[in-house]
Amino acid sequence: MSSKRAKAKTTKKRPQRATSNVFAMFDQSQIQEFKEAFNMIDQNRDGFIDKEDLHDMLASLGKNPTDEYLEGMMSEAPGPINFTMFLTMFGEKLNGTDPEDVIRNAFACFDEEASGFIHEDHLRELLTTMGDRFTDEEVDEMYREAPIDKKGNFNYVEFTRILKHGAKDKDD
């Protein structure tokens, strides 16, 4: 009996506590949102995000990512990407980053050419069909003062600057 207790005590010392620190970085609602995002990306529902999951997710958004692009994304992780690793990676990215960078990088996820622009129709589709969905009225409100050129390209770099620092006066 005492040998079983000794084994139990040794077993208790083995679990790594690093994962619990990751979960402590976020409140429950944030963790739930990350879980929803993870599940949206984990297309084959195997509990891991792999290159095929990323490809399928981007293809569902109308993108045709190259293997090189996908490999670059996968190389961000030191190993298989389960939910804990996903949360850890976001924790590292969000820890100490400027909110302006976070907002700009969120838009950049959908800018495959890294041009700083997303076509307004495509952005509307994304905002009204993914995550915390916007209504068409909310998108219209956002577009009222948004930097959109004559070709319908939404300048998310400038928009992020406006969100953070305010709009420039039109009289200047």
Curated annotation (Swiss-Prot):
GO terms for biological process: myofibril assembly; platelet aggregation; regulation of muscle contraction; stress fiber assembly. The lineage of its organism: Eukaryota, Metazoa, Chordata, Craniata, Vertebrata. Ca(2+) binds at D42, N44, D46, D53. Residues 1-20 are annotated as: Disordered. Myosin regulatory subunit that plays an important role in regulation of both smooth muscle and nonmuscle cell contractile activity via its phosphorylation. Implicated in cytokinesis, receptor capping, and cell locomotion. In myoblasts, may regulate PIEZO1-dependent cortical actomyosin assembly involved in myotube formation. This is Myosin regulatory light polypeptide 9. This chain binds calcium. Coiled coil: none annotated. Smooth muscle tissues and in some, but not all, nonmuscle cells. It is found in: Cytoplasm, Cytoskeleton; Cytoplasm, Cell cortex. The gene is MYL9. It comes from Homo sapiens (Human). Phosphorylation increases the actin-activated myosin ATPase activity and thereby regulates the contractile activity. It is required to generate the driving force in the migration of the cells but not necessary for localization of myosin-2 at the leading edge. Phosphorylation is required for myotube formation. Phosphorylated by DAPK3; DAPK3-mediated phosphorylation is inhibited by LUZP1.
